Amino acid sequence: MKYIIANFKMNATQELINHFLNNLTLFDEQKIIIGLAPGDLYLKTFVNLAEIKKVNLYAQNPSLHNKGPYTGQISCLQLLDINIKNALVGHSEIRIDFSQSIIDQKIKISMDLLEQVIICVGETFDAYKQNKSLNFVLNQLANIINYKGLKKIIIAYEPIWAIGTDLELDFKHINYMIEGIKTYLYNCTGINIPILYGGSVNDNNINELCNQKLIDGFLIGNASLDVNVFNKIIDKCK
């Protein structure tokens, strides 16, 4: 099974999402799972069309609270109220503003209430240069092994220094990191948790990425905004 998840970040419009969903290439649901994080504003609008198109919708940043005086936040209970059952949690662009403790609380409540949670992890450029990448990422995962709902999670490994850049991918490093994460999680939980790769995934490098057998799928940012490019990525993963 391959997971191919589009993260529109804060780039979506109704027109863009509608065009994306209505122009997706055909795919085998038994082999590929397609997901879209369009921006929480648009989740309710497109929940029915996404279901018809067999696309899983994801919230981008659920609150650590269920309800209360938290202006501007969206809780997991509110997501469930509009039939949204999945979320991304801990993306590097979110981690800039929140401590690891807050991210862990977001992860825990999402795992408690939602059906699927994609937990984003990734090291800084300094950690990469100092050969501390794996320790950096495992520290981000240290607490989740004690949470309930581990079979609900997917890990998206996105080296921070590779997101939104044209840097050449270091495939040796990617394999080292994904193998290290998989081994750590299996040793701690006994569960084979899927690991996705994110970080400047596009139609130019997808061939080589698909050849990396440890990768269970992809979290795709900018390249997903063009449905034709996204379709090429799907086709390569078939």
Curated annotation (Swiss-Prot):
The keyword Cytoplasm applies. Transmembrane segments: none annotated. Disulfide bonds: none annotated. Belongs to the triosephosphate isomerase family. SUPFAM superfamilies: Triosephosphate isomerase (TIM). Its EC number is 5.3.1.1. It is an enzyme of class 5 (isomerase). One of its GO terms (cellular component) is cytosol. Keywords: Cytoplasm, Gluconeogenesis, Glycolysis, Isomerase. Its main location: cytoplasm. Involved in the gluconeogenesis. Catalyzes stereospecifically the conversion of dihydroxyacetone phosphate (DHAP) to D-glyceraldehyde-3-phosphate (G3P). GO terms for biological process: gluconeogenesis; glyceraldehyde-3-phosphate biosynthetic process; glycerol catabolic process; glycolytic process. Homodimer. Pathway: Carbohydrate biosynthesis; gluconeogenesis; Carbohydrate degradation; glycolysis; D-glyceraldehyde 3-phosphate from glycerone phosphate: step 1/1. It is found in: Cytoplasm. The active site is at residues 91, 158. The gene is tpiA. GO terms for molecular function: triose-phosphate isomerase activity. Substrate binds at residues 7-9, 164, 200. This is Triosephosphate isomerase. HAMAP family: TIM_B. It catalyses: D-glyceraldehyde 3-phosphate = dihydroxyacetone phosphate.
